Amino acid sequence: MIEQQKRKGPELPLVPVKRQRHELLLGAGSGPGAGQQQATPGALLQAGPPRCSSLQAPIMLLSGHEGEVYCCKFHPNGSTLASAGFDRLILLWNVYGDCDNYATLKGHSGAVMELHYNTDGSMLFSASTDKTVAVWDSETGERVKRLKGHTSFVNSCYPARRGPQLVCTGSDDGTVKLWDIRKKAAIQTFQNTYQVLAVTFNDTSDQIISGGIDNDIKVWDLRQNKLTYTMRGHADSVTGLSLSSEGSYLLSNAMDNTVRVWDVRPFAPKERCVKIFQGNVHNFEKNLLRCSWSPDGSKIAAGSADRFVYVWDTTSRRILYKLPGHAGSINEVAFHPDEPIIISASSDKRLYMGEIQ
């Protein structure tokens, strides 16, 4: 009955129209329901700039943390990464494919403030507000050592690049400590006046470099067991330190909204600050915003409270990238060891991994 009530339209001749190939390609990747269509490879190539990494997509979102994410580091082999923060958990992720969270390391009873792999990637070190530093086997995920001795929050840790496995730590108790993971207690302690927020070794691991709320960067000599020299220039707390891969220059991030490069070679001129970068900002949240070098030293990156990822050209000091996307303070940005990829950790509980040219 329904068929009979339909009015017939005018009889029009059907004329086939040959569509150009580029129209077919564009049509395959656009319009409603495009996701269900079998787009040809040509359509994907036309979607954006050429790809420059092995990531599944130019930007990958890693979500799984239940609180602010304070730190993130790529494994030295580049295939996995670790992240940690306020939820006291360390999450391990695959870099390629779907970026699965393949393991969760539990053991800290306070927020995890900083993470570092050792040089060969066999161990992962984590500093926590539970006053301890944990040493993890990165293959099995087991905690193999717990370093206890600080009397307040441990804000920073850094493993020696070579030699016996030493690690230095900095704490709110105002001390910088040196540990040999084969021993139970710290093997050296340096007393600073104020809270220590960031530490690293020099290239030969015979000096510890520290920064904190006294605005100064201090270099402690392990052989002579004393303060060797102090680098002044920042006008507010130093929240992040990073040594360049060849060991000649130190990067610092501070609450005076500057990122600085310092010459830490022996017998360098007295004025060791060689470059100042601006753009990133700190705010009332007072998060410990870190900083990092690209593997070849041509770029630097730093955390920022304005929700942007900042990447600078080291030579020209120009901002190469100011990347949006996060909804909270960016606490750390790290470079991939082999590919043009960066990862950012944010107070919005997320990590973004993306490729840069």
From Swiss-Prot:
GO biological process entries: mRNA splicing, via spliceosome; RNA processing; RNA splicing; RNA splicing, via transesterification reactions
WD repeat ranges per the UniProt record: 64-103, 107-146, 149-189, 191-230, 233-272, 283-322, 325-357
Cross-link (Glycyl lysine isopeptide (Lys-Gly) (interchain with G-Cter in SUMO2)): 18, 270
Compartments (UniProt record): Nucleus
GO CC entries: catalytic step 2 spliceosome; cytosol; nuclear speck; nucleoplasm; nucleus; sno(s)RNA-containing ribonucleoprotein complex; U2-type catalytic step 2 spliceosome; U4/U6 x U5 tri-snRNP complex
Residues modified as Asymmetric dimethylarginine: 21
Cross-referenced SMART domains: WD40 (SM00320)
GO molecular function: RNA binding
Any Pfam family the entry gives: WD40
Keywords per UniProt: Isopeptide bond, Methylation, mRNA processing, mRNA splicing, Nucleus, Repeat, Spliceosome, Ubl conjugation, WD repeat
Function, as annotated: Required for pre-mRNA splicing as component of the activated spliceosome. Component of the U5 small nuclear ribonucleoprotein (snRNP) complex and the U4/U6-U5 tri-snRNP complex, building blocks of the spliceosome. As a component of the minor spliceosome, involved in the splicing of U12-type introns in pre-mRNAs.
Subunit structure comment from the entry: Component of the pre-catalytic and catalytic spliceosome complexes. Component of the postcatalytic spliceosome P complex. Part of the U5 snRNP complex. Interacts with PRPF8. Component of the U4/U6-U5 tri-snRNP complex composed of the U4, U6 and U5 snRNAs and at least PRPF3, PRPF4, PRPF6, PRPF8, PRPF31, SNRNP200, TXNL4A, WDR57, SNRNP40, DDX23, CD2BP2, PPIH, SNU13, EFTUD2, SART1 and USP39. Component of the minor spliceosome, which splices U12-type introns.
Protein name per UniProt: U5 small nuclear ribonucleoprotein 40 kDa protein
Organism encoding this protein: Homo sapiens (Human)
Gene name for this UniProt entry: SNRNP40
